[in-house]
């Protein structure tokens, strides 16, 4: 019983303590919060008081430091001479017009072609010419560090106290100087710059004087009036020189790239048909993989993500890819229509000849049936032969257009830079061998002899050199059109791969290769071709041959 009483007493005391703590905690929290608020308020007030007194002092000290560094380097005894200021302007690229050589693909410095005199009234129409200039008003005004915020905008407020003893000298030089008409759009030399600020009488430029010149120097640097691009007077001669250099390198690269065609033609007679079929299955897949990979991983990213490409421009470049697809579709469709009408005309002519022959010979009904059967058999066999022939011609023309676009891409790349041209040539070379072997598979299945393949390979290579000539000319004379050529090339590559090569992979004759083995070989070739193009796209900068030159403009 006694234990229960003690337990109840302890429980009552604990409950009482808990209630007291629950009541006191909000009050303690409020007092602590108020103390923190008061402390923060006092700190903020002290910071504001410190800022109003010391903020600009620190700015003055920083300004004085940089002025001291400049005057130590270009001045003498704390002042700048005429020669010292001229040396400073020369190190900044000011004081005289200098020629700036612009490389292809680089952004040009924004320059203005303004070279006329204008009045200060153009910028301040509300101020008459008889009034004192605002600069002099700010120089005559007196202010203290504790001045009002309205006084902070005056020029003398931002002068370091150590420099204010030079202010009277500045005012005396600026007071009688007319500021109505100055050449602000020209590249000012030292004499013109000093005359604009009324400092022509000053034998030495003090730090106070120099603070007046700084905005003019910054404007001259930002506007680029002292820069003149080489395109203004000497780009024509360098364009012709760059065209010849690009044409030479691109032709040499295309000559090396054309070697896989000869290799493929040399390998064909040495291999048995069954072995050649097994070898060509992965090669056809590799041709599709390299063509699609080159278009999607190399050409389109280079064109769409070029410099100064906005969203609308990127959309139109994507439309250019679609234009390449449509262009080759129209070309091959016209080729097929021509072959179709030619076959119709041939059938009609054969039928008329057969009827005339039957009428002249007066053959028996049995002979007529035999002749009719022959005509029917020819009609049945001709569509298949026509389909194979049309496919072969489409592959030949597609290969010619492919080489033409290859030449365009290589010519444009070499016209922009040698390293970029070699990088594009490496990419084209990597997919040229499987592409040529894939074309060879289609043409051999159509029954083309090796001699005919050799002739058309030579004609296709000539189209490549035509593309090199056109690409070099476009890249040098119309460099802004280079991305559009790349996107058009990408569209042609996609069409050749997906419309010509892919159907042959899916529906072509298997020969002695089983369907499963054929599928595995084609899938392996497709992945290999895509992997090759991916590696080139990712490590293009590493595999590009460095010649110590970034552009043809340096040659």
Swiss-Prot record:
This is Zinc transporter ZIP5. Uniporter that transports zinc(2+) into polarized cells of enterocytes, pancreatic acinar and endoderm cells across the basolateral membrane and participates, notably, in zinc excretion from the intestine by the uptake of zinc from the blood into the intestine. The transport mechanism is temperature- and concentration-dependent and saturable. Mediates zinc homeostasis that is essential for venous angiogenesis. Coiled coil: none annotated. It comes from Danio rerio. Residues 108-148, 363-383 are annotated as: Disordered. It catalyses: Zn(2+)(in) = Zn(2+)(out). It is found in: Basolateral cell membrane. Its main location: membrane. InterPro entries: ZIP (IPR003689), ZIP_Transporter (IPR050799). Residues 363-374 have a biased composition (Polar residues). One of its GO terms (molecular function) is zinc ion transmembrane transporter activity. Belongs to the ZIP transporter (TC 2.A.5) family. GO terms for biological process: intracellular monoatomic cation homeostasis; zinc ion import across plasma membrane. Residues 264-314, 430-452, 504-518 are cytoplasmic. It holds the Pfam family Zip. GO terms for cellular component: basolateral plasma membrane; plasma membrane. Residues 1-242, 336-408, 474-482, 540-555 are extracellular. Keywords: Cell membrane, Ion transport, Membrane, Transmembrane, Transmembrane helix, Transport, Zinc, Zinc transport. Disruption phenotype: Homozygous knockout fishes laking develop normally until 48 hpf, when they develop cardiac ischaemia. It is a multi-pass membrane protein. The chain crosses the membrane at residues 243-263, 315-335, 409-429, 453-473, 483-503, 519-539. Signal peptide: none annotated.
């Amino acid at each position: 019983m006694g234990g229960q009483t003690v337990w109840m007493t302890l429980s009552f005391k604990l409950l009482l303590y808990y209630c007291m703590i629950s009541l006191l905690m909000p009050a303690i929290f409020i007092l602590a919060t108020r103390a923190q608020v008061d402390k923060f308020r006092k700190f903020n007030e002290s910071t504001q008081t410190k800022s109003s007194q010391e903020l600009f002092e620190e700015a003055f000290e920083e300004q004085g430091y940089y002025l001291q560094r400049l005057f130590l380097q270009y001045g003498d005894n704390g002042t700048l001479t005429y020669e010292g200021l001229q040396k400073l302007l020369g190190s900044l690229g000011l004081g005289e017009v200098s020629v700036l050589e612009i490389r292809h693909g680089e952004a040009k410095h924004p320059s203005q072609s303004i070279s006329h005199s204008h009045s200060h009234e153009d910028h301040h129409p509300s101020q008459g010419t008889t009034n004192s200039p605002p600069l002099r008003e700010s120089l005559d005004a007196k202010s203290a560090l504790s001045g009002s915020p309205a006084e902070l905008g005056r020029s003398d407020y931002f002068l370091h106290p150590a420099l204010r003893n030079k202010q009277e000298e500045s005012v005396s030089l600026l007071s009688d100087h007319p500021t109505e008409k100055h050449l602000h759009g020209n590249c000012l030399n030292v004499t013109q710059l000093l005359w604009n600020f009324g400092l022509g009488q000053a034998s030495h430029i003090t730090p106070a004087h120099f603070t007046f010149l700084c905005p003019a120097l910054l404007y001259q640097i930002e506007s680029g009036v002292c820069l003149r691009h080489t395109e203004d007077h000497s780009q024509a001669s360098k364009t012709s020189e760059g065209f010849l250099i690009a044409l030479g390198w691109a032709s040499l690269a295309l000559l090396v790239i054309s070697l896989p065609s000869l290799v493929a033609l040399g390998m064909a007679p040495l291999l048995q048909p069954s072995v050649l079929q097994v070898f060509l299955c992965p090669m056809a897949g590799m041709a599709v993989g390299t063509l699609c990979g080159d278009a999607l991983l190399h050409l389109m990213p280079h064109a769409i993500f070029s410099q100064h490409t906005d969203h609308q421009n990127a959309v139109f470049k994507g439309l250019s890819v679609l234009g390449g697809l449509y262009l080759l579709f129209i070309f091959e469709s016209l080729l097929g229509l021509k072959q179709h009408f030619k076959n119709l005309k041939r059938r009609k002519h054969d039928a008329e000849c057969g009827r005339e022959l039957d009428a002249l010979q007066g053959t028996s009904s049995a002979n007529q049936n035999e002749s009719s059967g022959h005509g029917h058999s020819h009609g049945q066999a001709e569509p298949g032969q026509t389909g194979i022939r049309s496919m072969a011609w489409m592959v030949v023309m597609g290969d010619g257009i492919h080489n033409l676009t290859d030449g365009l891409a290589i010519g444009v790349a070499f016209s922009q830079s040698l390293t970029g041209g070699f990088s594009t040539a490496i990419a084209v070379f990597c997919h040229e061998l499987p592409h040529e072997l894939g074309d060879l598979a289609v043409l051999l299945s159509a029954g083309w002899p090796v001699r005919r393949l050799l002739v058309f390979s030579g004609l296709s290579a000539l189209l490549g050199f035509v593309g090199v000539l056109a690409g070099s000319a476009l890249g040098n004379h119309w460099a802004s059109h280079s991305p559009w050529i790349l996107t058009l090339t990408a569209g042609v590559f996609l069409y050749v791969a997906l419309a010509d090569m892919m159907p042959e992979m899916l529906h072509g004759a298997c020969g002695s290769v089983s369907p499963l083995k054929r599928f595995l070989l084609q899938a392996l070739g497709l992945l290999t071709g895509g992997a090759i193009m991916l590696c080139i796209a990712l490590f293009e900068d590493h595999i590009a041959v460095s010649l110590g030159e970034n552009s043809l403009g340096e040659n």
